[in-house]
Amino acid sequence: MNRAAIAAGKPSGSISTGKPRRKTRAEVSEEMKHEIREAFDLFDADRSGRIDFHELKVAMRALGFDVKKEEIQRIMNEYDRDQLGEITFQDFEEVMIEKISNRDPTEEILKAFRLFDDDATGRISLKNLRRVAKELSENISDEELLAMIQEFDRDGDGEIDEEDFIAILRSTSAFS
């Protein structure tokens, strides 16, 4: 256990997020572990097996976590046991698995919604879907896009609102 963990009365490696701690999932998918490794390796420029404050911030951002300087500093203080200003891959993996396990699924869904709703109307329209399809280099006809909207448009207004979008994604195993 490190000093910060002992002082806080918690096991080494747990991160204070200000939220009640959820039960950590015993497993993170192998694909996710691979992504964690890739993010670490990408920013471990000197291949030392360690990353510093700035590399940690960018690696976490690459994994979808836009964290403030204060949180990065807390992580560094907790995991930089030898006071070199760096953390190891094992520490990074532990931090990321905990953060991934503690993600708020609704917040993740709303982030995805905002990627579609680029005009900030609170609704996903045919225009929004057309733009996303184009960005993804998908050649999808307006008829197919409209069929997608109609399939999930619960109030029948021709657009998908946040409530519709949340219901769609909650029905998948990724967010259940």
UniProtKB/Swiss-Prot annotation:
Ca(2+) 1 binds at residues 44, 46, 48, 50, 55. The keyword Cell inner membrane does not apply. Keywords: Calcium, Cell cycle, Cell division, Cytoplasm, Cytoskeleton, Metal-binding, Mitosis, Repeat. SMART domains: EFh (SM00054). Its main location: cytoplasm. Ca(2+) 2 binds at residues 153, 155, 157, 159, 164. PROSITE patterns: EF_HAND_1, EF_HAND_2. Residues 31-66, 67-102, 104-139, 140-175 form the EF-hand domain. It is found in: Cytoplasm, Cytoskeleton, Microtubule organizing center, Centrosome. One of its GO terms (molecular function) is calcium ion binding. Gene3D superfamilies: EF-hand. Monomer. Belongs to the centrin family. Plays a fundamental role in microtubule-organizing center structure and function. PANTHER family: CENTRIN 3, MYOSIN LIGHT CHAIN 1, 3. This is Caltractin. It comes from Giardia intestinalis (Giardia lamblia). The lineage of its organism: Eukaryota, Metamonada, Diplomonadida, Hexamitidae, Giardiinae.
